[in-house]
């Protein structure tokens, strides 16, 4: 992946952790969304023909509870819906926050490209959001870059990305334990192209320390 592009997505993911966001002079609209009911935070930035969405990662006990709900849920409105299943905790949080309803209001006939990013739990939300938008707005160009993201859906979900969202990249810090969850034993699969950074300090040793966005930034800029 191009380093400049990687840094672009990393910077916006980093900014999603700020509670106050400074508007851009070049954007038509910049909004920091904090849904207190679901404890989901994300940045929504709108340009004339482009939209950028950046989701914050795990930031509270509520987020952790969503992460631990390993059961999968069938998604009825997507192609091959009988086969596609998504992590129930992530999907419930996404739908309850009405993220799609918020984004669809800023999509216009001029919208040609949507960029979506996120870290950790926010990366999982970014993937669900991308799949939802790509299904409903197939003529728009999408680019998705996520950092330290857990497995979010099953094999059919991964195949959906291969077909409809081929420009999806997953950045994985070697040693990041969250990227190993939920286990494949539960039927979960990663999506998109995988780019691994860093190195193992001890073979097959994973930790939460390697999961922080600061660790990702350090390894990328090193």
Residue ranges and their predicted role:
Residues 1-117, 121-222:
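Non-catalytic, mobile gating and regulatory segments of ester bond hydrolases
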